[in-house]
Amino acid sequence: REEKYDGALSDGVFHYFPNEAYAQEVMEGMLEKTRGNIAILDVHDATKEEEFFAFRRQLDPDYDEHYRGLNKLFYDRSFFEKFAKKHGLTVSFNPLALDGYWNAPFVYSVFFSREAERKD
């Protein structure tokens, strides 16, 4: 029997993944290994991608040269909503509330929870 964990947490790594297919595989693994909630923190917001790069280029005019080949993956919330629907999970999104963290306006957190089993 494979051990299950109370929950799973990912903090600040999803934007380093090569594509959404890989992210999907990771979430499937997180779901398989848990019996409780899943939290994915520091997800780069696709609706703020242009703002993110404009801000970075303002801080570092040579940003594109300095970070060439170090791509970031930005996610639409619908990606996580589809995953939740497929697996009967509830999903919620929260802005990152971390005073002084320059990246906070460009990211959000995702929380999946399993539906409570009904006891009649």
Model regions and ranges:
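Alpha-helix termination/capping residues and helix-transition junctions
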Residues: E2, L31-E32
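A conserved beta-strand element that flanks and buttresses the S-adenosyl-L-methionine
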Residues: L9
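Class I (Rossmann-like) S-adenosyl-L-methionine-dependent methyltransferase catalytic domain
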Residues: R1, A39-D120
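Active-site micro-motifs of SAM-dependent methyltransferase domains
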Residues: H15-Y16, D45
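Short glycine-dipeptide loop
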Residues: K33-A39
